[in-house]
Each structure stands twice: as C-alpha cells, then as structure tokens.
C-alpha cells in the first residue's frame, strides 16, 4: 500500500506542475499540455480506485485509519485538480476569443488607414465602403469564432475518448477478476481441465475481439482529430 501511495504522491506532483504551467501560459499553451493533464488525471483516478480497494481489504489492519485519511486526501486532491483544470480551460477559451476580437479590430483600423490615409482630399470612407468593410470584418470574426468552437469541440472529443478508454480498461480488469473467480468455482465443482481449457480458449478469442474493437476505436478518434485539425 505504501508503494501505491508513493506513486499517487508522484502523480499529484506531476499534475500540480502541469496545471501551473497551463495557468502561466493560458493563451499560448499547446493542446498537448491539456491532453497530458487529462491523461494524468485519468491515471490518478485509477490509482485512487486501486488504493481504495486495498483499504477496503485491510479494514482490520491497525494502520487502516492512516490509509483512509490518505485516501480522503487523494479524493480531495482529485476534486481540486479537476475543478481547477475546468476553470483554466474556460479562462483560456475566453482569452482566445478576446484576443481574436482585438486582432480583428486592429486589422480593421489598419486597413482603413491604408485605404484613406494616403489621400489628403479624401474625407473618409463612404457608407457603402463602411458596410463592405464591416461585412468583411464580421466574416473574419465569425471564422475565428468557428475555429474557437471547433477547438472546444475537439477538447470535448478528447475528453470523451479518454473517458471511453478509462471505461474499457476498467471493464477489462473486471472481466479478468470474474474469469479468475469463475475458474476457481469450476475447479471447486469438479469440472474437468479440458472443459476449463475450452472456456479459456473461448475467453482468449473474446479478448482478441475486445482489443480489435479497442484499436478500431483509437483509429476512429485519430481520423476525427485529423479532420478537425
């Protein structure tokens, strides 16, 4: 249990470091940093589940109270990390939208100066020209907004993929434990080894189907990411 606890401590340190880097460079941080944080949070959740199982199995241990306190601290850390990560992502989206808006306004003023500042007899843009310029700027702004929404959707897809991966791993571990218990039960009931081997062979085939479906899922997500990028 101590080794698993130490592993969890290292994970909290890594997540804290990545969140700090993300906070310092919200608008310039790469998407890969967000992916790294999401992966670290998923791994930390798995560590907490495993640590919780060990604590439940050793309730009669004298040091169980200490481990329960550590488990509570891990759960609180996970909640704080998740809340801060969600908040930082929202701040990043708002900062990018504001930056895009300011860039569009700056381009608009620069274009107007270039078009009308060189002619001293020009009194300024006509109403039609202003409308055309506004339409152009609005089009650019809508394009930037669409790209920002696409980025948000991409983040959402990454989160969904990470959650699906976590669920698949958890289900695989559950099936493995059930298979072990099932085999022990068959031996207790006196089922022949040949029958057990047949069942294991069938289970292995199902496992290959499982991993094939998993690889297919990864390929689908890769194509989705490629389309969005």
UniProtKB/Swiss-Prot annotation:
Vesicular topological intervals: 229
GO molecular function, one term: SNAP receptor activity
Chain ranges on the Cytoplasmic side, renumbered to this chain: 1-207
Keywords, ordered alphabetically: Endoplasmic reticulum, ER-Golgi transport, Golgi apparatus, Membrane, Protein transport, Transmembrane, Transmembrane helix, Transport
Region (Disordered): 89-135
Protein family membership: Belongs to the BOS1 family.
UniProt-recorded name of the protein: Protein transport protein BOS1
Organism from which the protein derives: Debaryomyces hansenii (strain ATCC 36239 / CBS 767 / BCRC 21394 / JCM 1990 / NBRC 0083 / IGC 2968)
Gene name in the database record: BOS1
